[in-house]
Amino acid sequence: MGLRVKENGKSEGHPVMGWIGVASADNIILRESEQTSVWSFLTRKLGKQIQEAKQMTANTFAGAASHTEVNWRTINWSTVHQNVRRLQARIVKATQEGKWGKVKALQHLLTHSFSGKALAVRRVTENQGKNTAGVDKETWDTPDKKAEAIQTLKQRGYHPQPLRRVYIPKSNGRLRPLGIPALSCRAMQALYLLALNPIAETTGDRNSYGFRPERSTADAIEQCFNVLSHSYSAPWTLEGDIKACFDGISHEWLEAHIPMDKTMLHKWLKAGYIDKHIFHQTEEGTPQGGPITPPAMLQTLRIFFRR
């Protein structure tokens, strides 16, 4: 980890860092041992009754049954957003109360709902990378393709495709590797992002601004001014760079600490990538380019700086 210490004074025009370590919030470190076993116990004992109850609740939040034909043009997006936000609010509340078994159950409900799947497909087909294809060269550029994508976005039997490796220039003249997932994998990651973000935002450091929804560079600049403009402010700022942060992180550590479906996360981490028509396995690191990577790294940095 390289560090530079600079005396506070005139601005040198550097971009604001994505991580401003001024003061850590009272965050919660998620541990498997902290998760209640109530949900798994009920699932084992009540089996069919629990599954029926989950399905009834899922249908309430879904807005449409996942097995029926979907017409992209007639989807009520206001209802979809409302359903997703309602479940996310429940995840936030359960996180604040430390009810990790309930968090897990609500995440499952959201990632298997029609509203969650529809919103995930919409987000990956309307963002700036909507026309950027993965290794399968497939894009969802028509309403019919988008509707079909919702119906085929299923966890059972899901196997992620390898990433398409591309390189973009960095400010220092070097190249930054990016892994471009196929649209089907991007949509699946966007779906699980809906269930992970409420936890990441609830437990995240209040002074972290990079890769955060509803936060911008202007917000980071304002916080820097608020912290450094007083006579009693710290006379020094510390800038650090974690070398190859994305490339060298342990898969086992991520699977143990990121509060999401472990099986799905494992599949993404081990998907590999194709570079110049050659397949490469991934034994460590998380690719830059997928929707799930930023919140996963924010959770990693939160725990790192807390310790």
Segments from the language model and where they lie:
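Generic recognition of stable, solvent-exposed alpha-helical segments in well-folded globular domains
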Residues: 79-82, 86, 101, 105, ...
